[in-house]
Regions:
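Switch/coupling subdomain of P-loop NTPase systems
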Residues: 96, 100-103, 108-136, 140-143, ...
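Conserved nucleotide-binding/hydrolysis micro-motifs of P-loop NTPases
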Residues: 25, 51-52, 76-78, 106-112, ...
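Conserved G1/Walker A P-loop phosphate-binding module
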Residues: 1-114, 123, 142-143, 148
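Short, glycine/charged-enriched secondary-structure capping and boundary segments
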Residues: 22, 84-87, 116-119, 219-222, ...
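C-terminal-of-GTPase-core extension/linker across diverse P-loop GTPases
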Residues: 2-8, 13, 19, 147-353, ...
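Flexible beta-alpha connector loops of hexameric P-loop NTPases
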Residues: 77-82, 118, 127-133, 152-157, ...
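A structural signal for alpha-helical segments
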Residues: 33, 86, 121, 153-160
Length: 366
């Protein structure tokens, strides 16, 4: 669906190591000096979903295809990025194109890896990044306000937009992000956001990069990040990027055994991918045939014809009905035939809102 998650953080927090592990590549050079990521590294990542494997156990398809999310490793920034310091201009331009921000925060002690501020202070790091996002939004908004003031005489819409923009600027100048702006659901704000893509309005996932010894019991640094995320009504993940990067070279069975030895069911990166998918407001439905079992990505709240259109636009144009089985019923009755026999196969029309996990077969005519 062309949706992307931008990975950000100060230099040397483990951002590129996180990206390397996420993408199961070594694309982003991981080095102990600032700005080793200058051009954004991009990669398409499978979204872990154990339901696909369960469906495949029943259907025995030739192949399994996952939903995917694009991750973008964006160059580290420093204080003053909004004014072009460091690689600030590149950073801000690249992050504007992302729908969700994954903020990696250093929560590990290691004298061999320098910190840009010479000390480990995760809340200060978070404040630095989020302040730069707000300052960048102010700079962007100032330019739009100038254009709106010039358009007042010739445009009827300019007045409402200008009032909203000025109110938002006051809010931002109080160092509050756009996501807490009281009018952020108004038509005027949404129009401004669609055009300007305010950085401080984007959803944020906080990733505490901890040492291996702190995976099961969070250290004080990570606890501070977790509490901050909770206060922001944002998601939080703790992981050891170095460890996750090392797992890239392991087989699936080795990874499973290794995670069991750590006392966890899934890696921090698997959780990160899932949460990113969730924060994008996406759900999955499935198609299950002998050729392939496949996960399809749609926005939550999509109708059956819209879901069909993800496969092919002709499916949406000529939509007749959707033969629907819930995932739980498909598994419980061991496939389509069993579900049909038990009366669990439903015929849904164009007004049906597809649910996460639906197994669908579309009928259409063009």
């Amino acid at each position: 669906m062309g949706l992307s998650v931008g990975i950000v953080g100060l230099p040397n927090v483990g951002k590129s190591s996180t990206f390397n592990a996420l993408t199961k590549t070594q694309n982003a050079q991981s080095a102990n000096y600032p700005f080793c990521t200058i051009e954004p590294n991009k990669a398409i990542v499978n979204v872990p979903d154990r339901r696909l494997d369960a469906l495949a156990q029943i259907v025995k398809p030739e192949r399994i295809l996952h939903s995917v999310v694009e991750f973008v490793d964006i160059a580290g920034l420093i204080k003053g990025a909004s004014k072009g310091e460091g690689l600030g201009n590149q950073f801000l331009a690249n992050i504007k194109e992302c729908e969700v921000i994954l903020q990696v925060v250093r929560c590990f002690e290691n004298d061999n890896i320098t910190h840009v501020n010479d000390k480990i202070d995760p809340l200060n790091d978070i404040e630095t990044i989020e302040l730069e996002l707000i300052l960048a939004d102010i700079a962007t908004l100032d330019k739009r306000i100038d254009r709106l003031q010039k358009a007042l005489k010739s445009s009827k819409d300019a007045k409402n937009l200008l009032e909203c923009a000025l109110s938002l600027k006051t809010h931002l100048e109080e160092l509050k992000p756009a996501k807490t702006f009281p009018l952020n659901t108004s038509e005027a704000f949404l129009e401004l956001d669609k055009e300007l893509r305010f950085l401080s309005h984007k959803k944020m996932i906080y990733v505490a990069n901890v040492g291996e010894e702190d995976l099961n019991a969070l250290n004080e640094h990570a606890k501070k990040v977790k509490n901050h995320a909770k206060a922001q009504n944002s998601e939080f993940v703790a992981l050891c990027a170095k460890l996750e990067e090392e797992m890239v070279s392991m087989s699936g069975d080795e990874v499973k055994e290794f995670l069991q030895s750590l006392g966890v069911e899934e890696s921090g990166l698997e959780k990160t991918i899932r949460l990113s998918f969730k924060e994008l407001g996406l759900i999955n439905y499935f198609t299950a045939g002998v050729k392939e079992v496949r996960s399809w990505t749609i926005k939550k709240g999509s109708s059956a014809p819209m879901a069909a259109g993800v496969i092919h636009k002709d499916f949406e144009k000529g939509f007749i009905r959707a033969e629907t089985i819930s995932y739980d019923d498909f598994i419980a009755y061991k496939g389509e035939a069993g579900a049909k026999e038990k009366g669990a196969l439903r015929i849904e029309g164009k007004d049906y809102i597809v649910q996460d996990g639906d197994v669908l077969h579309f009928r259409f005519n063009v």
